[in-house]
Amino acid sequence: MNDTAPTQGVYLRFFVHENRRHGGMLLYDWLLAEAKKLGLSGGTAFRSIAGYGRHGVTHEAHFLELAGQETVRVDFVVTREAADKMLARVREENLPMFYAILPAEFGTLGGGK
């Protein structure tokens, strides 16, 4: 792999509850699968350790009674056009969820021998 010129794009983040489902799948898996279908080049799901949301409820992974209620963040570093396609897909399904879009510059570095 060789270096690529930096690309201007966005960091698209979705925040969902770990146990939330859509179409028979965990919602974070659904987001990753739909992004792949739309041609987004990659995505990653991260499980949170602790946090709180707009309702002020603290979620921590070590409380057994909150198992499955932790937040999963699903991230994509993509062009604005790709982010808009993904947001449109989520809107088509009428899925309520929080998201954030941040400006990003991205590319690839280096290569092997």
Question: Model-found features: residue ranges?
Answer:
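Positively charged, small/polar-rich N-terminal and surface patches that mediate targeting and assembly
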Residues: M1-K113
